[in-house]
């Protein structure tokens, strides 16, 4: 069962075509990761699937409904999006930012009710940010800020979370902190998660499903073991990679790789 899908989706900037005839389905209740080289269309696809960008052809379907026919508020009730390097208004506290997640559910003057407060408290606790509720966003570390943004997304009460490079600019410990949080949200609450990640080993470790892209085209999709193979990485990234399976996770790990400079060495998969 799929909660988010595209049908013959076409995306572009002016006369430049980025993606054409894209057909993908995001498995419900799973973590799916888009991988591919810079400029392959990963973030563009994510933005279009969340209606931040408009498509020039085809459609995106959210729970069976075409999103271009849905109101922004209705979309926000079903799907939360965390863009790359989001910026909070100056002087905002953690609690204030997380409370913005309740906006799609409010009416009238937009005042928080008891249910809103309960959900905000829960989101802060789930992300380990309750003790920082009254702290200014500017006073937080990079990893803490990302957790606050995820808390805001949780406060929306959506089943579907879209994240564009949620570990960008974070050190290794903070990267794992964020990915383990997303993994827990998926396992304990059944959240459907679609994200863009550059680190292949992180993508493989934390994903149920991977979609490898090159120049706006799907090269391979499937489990990490099916997608992260030497042949696929050679075609997508132009690298000669050594892949082993981690016995603890049964997931593929890229041990080392070299750049392929001779196009004759590339294979068509």
Curated annotation (Swiss-Prot):
Superkingdom of this protein's organism: Bacteria
Domain ABC transporter: 4-240
UniProt-recorded Gene Ontology molecular function terms: ABC-type ferric hydroxamate transporter activity; ATP binding; ATP hydrolysis activity
Keywords: ATP-binding, Cell membrane, Ion transport, Iron, Iron transport, Membrane, Nucleotide-binding, Translocase, Transport
EC number: 7.2.2.16
InterPro entries noted in UniProt: AAA+_ATPase, ABC_transporter-like_ATP-bd, ABC_transporter-like_CS, P-loop_NTPase, Siderophore_ABC-ATPase
ATP-binding listed as a keyword: yes
Isomerase listed as a keyword: no
Pfam family, one: ABC_tran
GO cellular component: plasma membrane
Residues annotated to bind ATP: 36-43, 160-171
Compartments it resides in: Cell membrane
Catalytic activity: ATP + H2O + Fe(3+)-hydroxamate complex-[hydroxamate-binding protein]Side 1 = ADP + phosphate + Fe(3+)-hydroxamate complexSide 2 + [hydroxamate-binding protein]Side 1
PROSITE patterns associated with the record: ABC_TRANSPORTER_1 (PS00211), ABC_TRANSPORTER_2 (PS50893)
SMART domains listed in its UniProt record: AAA
Membrane topology reported for the UniProt record: Peripheral membrane protein
Class of the enzyme per the UniProt entry, highest EC level: translocase
Similarity comment: Belongs to the ABC transporter superfamily. Iron (Fe3+)-hydroxamate importer (TC 3.A.1.14.7) family.
Quaternary structure and interacting proteins, as annotated: The complex is composed of an ATP-binding protein (FhuC), two transmembrane proteins (FhuB and FhuG) and a solute-binding protein (FhuD or YxeB).
Stored PANTHER family: IRON(3+)-HYDROXAMATE IMPORT ATP-BINDING PROTEIN FHUC (PTHR42771:SF4)
Function in brief: Part of the ABC transporter complex FhuBGCD involved in iron(3+)-hydroxamate import. Responsible for energy coupling to the transport system.
Protein name: Iron(3+)-hydroxamate import ATP-binding protein FhuC
């Amino acid at each position: 069962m799929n909660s988010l899908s595209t049908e013959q989706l076409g995306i572009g900037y002016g006369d430049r075509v980025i993606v054409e005839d894209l057909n993908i389905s995001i498995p419900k209740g799973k973590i799916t990761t888009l991988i591919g080289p810079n400029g392959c269309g990963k973030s563009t696809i994510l933005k279009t699937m969340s209606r931040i960008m408009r498509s020039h052809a085809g459609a995106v379907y959210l729970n069976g409904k075409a999103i271009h026919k849905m109101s922004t508020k209705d979309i926000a009730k079903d799907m939360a999006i965390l863009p790359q390097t989001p910026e909070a208004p100056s002087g905002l506290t953690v609690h204030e930012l997380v409370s913005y997640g309740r906006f799609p559910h409010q009416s009238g003057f937009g005042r928080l009710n008891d249910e809103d407060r309960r959900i905000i408290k829960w989101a802060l606790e789930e992300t380990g940010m309750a003790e920082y509720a009254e702290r200014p966003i500017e006073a937080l570390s990079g990893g803490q800020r990302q957790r606050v943004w995820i808390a805001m997304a949780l406060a929306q009460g959506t089943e579907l979370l879209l994240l564009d490079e949620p570990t960008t600019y974070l050190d290794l410990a903070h990267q794992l902190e964020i990915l383990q949080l997303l993994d827990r949200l998926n396992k304990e609450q059944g959240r459907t998660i679609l994200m863009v990640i550059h680190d292949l080993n992180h993508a493989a470790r934390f994903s149920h499903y991977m979609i490898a892209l090159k120049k706006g085209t799907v090269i391979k999709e499937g489990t990490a073991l099916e997608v992260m193979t030497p042949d696929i990485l050679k075609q997508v990234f132009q690298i000669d990679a050594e892949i082993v399976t981690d016995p603890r996770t049964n997931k593929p790990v890229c041990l080392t790789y070299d750049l392929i400079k001779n196009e004759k060495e590339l294979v068509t998969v």
